[in-house]
Amino acid sequence: MQMRDDLGITTKLENGKAYLEFVLPETMGRLLSVLQIEIWEDADGGRLVFHGEYAPEEADSMTALLLRPHLWDGVRDPYVYLLKAQGRFGSVEYGEKMGGTKNEEESDPSEDIAEIVEVFWRQELAIYDVRVVDKKGIFLNEKEFLPHEVAYRFPPQISDVGTRVEQVRRDLERLVRMGVNVIRLEGTGTGAEGVNCSEVRTFYSLCRKRGFLTGDLWIRPKNLPVYRGLPGETTCQALLAADGRTLTERYYYYQAKWSSESVLYPALSTLHRQENGLVSLTIYSNQKKVVLYVDGVLFLFQSAASGDPEFIFEDIPVEKLPLHLAAEAGNLSISLTVTKL
């Protein structure tokens, strides 16, 4: 018996209907029995919504139709169906695999079977439609979609911050909070160097459950932020330091730019003394107004520019150190004590 999760599925939406086509993996042997395919209402096993049986001679044209399907709708509604399938397969003899000379009409197919295996599939099915319309933009299920995309690198197999799966789950939770809705897996071949196909499928499954698009947008934006930095690498776009623990200032910049979660974050790398002896500091926030206090006294408030998460405060007076700064935005506040400039 084999348990698998790699049944190929293509979907097409039209007039409130979902047309599905199932494709067996190329490595499968000959189908010897009826292949049963079922689709259940949710990934935890709810109501049965489709049951199909396909004879061996139909293996190259297995289709299904769902009326009024529940669509996967990104982070708004990351709905997935559960697909189950089972059938008996036979691995063929080496001579037949290599295109033996025996006439197919004269040979008995059963004589070429070396082994019979019962195969079961259990995997998720997300039904949705992504389209890029020239001069109009990107649409998910016919609604305009604004991509908030990052490139993702797999973590080490195991480290002091947990196993790879534990780290991926933690990463995706952080990316949800950041407001990301598209993840592009970096690497070549299977998607990442040193990662097997099963791990890549598990990663994509976790992404679907959290509402991330993966691999649907083929054009790679310039200066795409990268989630995980590498040892010895210097990139201002990395969102997580190479230690696997520390979120960088760029993470909070994009969180303030993309997330619906309230953000107020002083970018300490921008704190510096100007040529005139006064001080400058940039604060990232998605609030409408940020107020800055210097040594407990109101210094300045700034209103947000459209789509810009940066609030740049210049000419901050400093009579002596330590300098006490405090910022407020909405219901958020944060205080800083500066001892060195």
What are these regions (language model features)?
Residues 1-186, 191-194, 198, 202, ...:
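Secreted/periplasmic carbohydrate-active enzymes, especially glycoside hydrolases
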Residues 223-232:
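Substrate-binding cleft/loops of secretory-pathway carbohydrate-active enzymes
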Residues 192-224, 242, 253, 257:
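Catalytic-core region of carbohydrate-active enzymes that cleave or remodel glycosidic bonds
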Residues 60, 164, 230, 244-248:
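Short, structured coil/loop segments at alpha-helix boundaries
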Residues 1-2, 254-263:
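Proline/serine/threonine-rich low-complexity linkers at boundaries of modular beta-sandwich domains
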Residues 235-237, 241-252:
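A eukaryote-biased signal for short, well-structured alpha-helical docking elements
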Residues 129, 221, 236-238:
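Generic secondary-structure boundary/loop-capping signal
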